[in-house]
């Protein structure tokens, strides 16, 4: 996957906005999505020092892979690239809605209300389990043009952002599941192993 990033960096040298990506959920993801048990998912991502076309091209390919895999979020570490980059689209059924591209995201505030909701992950296909998270967050990040942004998110968007940001720190949603019995049952059913889970303490 490191070679893929080098190829992306050579695609263009101009400073242009990201091209619109079709939301059609068909075909094969253009990028390999690593699965639970792959060591790369447990490594910390690094901040992006310069937002240029290599980053925008990477985000574009991540969006294509996310849509093809029928996901609503994807983090760069999931494709083997240790960079603080997320793509998210909780409105994937709305062709006009713009996806979110978050570069170097930081959560600055968590709401006090906690909610339990079922989550899944493109790196652990077929496994769906409840996870408790704050229902609202505030964050800052840079957009695909490198501009600083701030936003408040709630509901599914807040959950998705937190889920994807966990990937930047080598954390997977199964690490946060409190019911070990349900977790083990789901993992075995889909061919995964509980030894690859690192519980959050």
Swiss-Prot record:
Cofactor(s), by name: Fe(2+)
Cofactor note: Binds 1 Fe(2+) ion.
Signal peptide per UniProt: none
GO-annotated molecular function: metal ion binding; peptide deformylase activity
SUPFAM superfamilies in alphabetical order: Peptide deformylase
Catalytic residues in the record: 164
GO BP term (any one): co-translational protein modification
Keywords attached to this entry: Hydrolase, Iron, Metal-binding, Protein biosynthesis
Keyword Phosphoprotein applies: no
Catalytic activity: N-terminal N-formyl-L-methionyl-[peptide] + H2O = N-terminal L-methionyl-[peptide] + formate
Transmembrane residue ranges: none
Listed EC numbers: 3.5.1.88
Residues at which Fe cation binds: 121, 163, 167
NCBIfam families, per the entry: pept_deformyl (TIGR00079), PRK00150.1-3 (NF001159)
Purpose of the protein: Removes the formyl group from the N-terminal Met of newly synthesized proteins. Requires at least a dipeptide for an efficient rate of reaction. N-terminal L-methionine is a prerequisite for activity but the enzyme has broad specificity at other positions.
HAMAP family, per the entry: Pep_deformylase (MF_00163)
Family: Belongs to the polypeptide deformylase family.
Name of the protein: Peptide deformylase
Designated gene of the protein: def
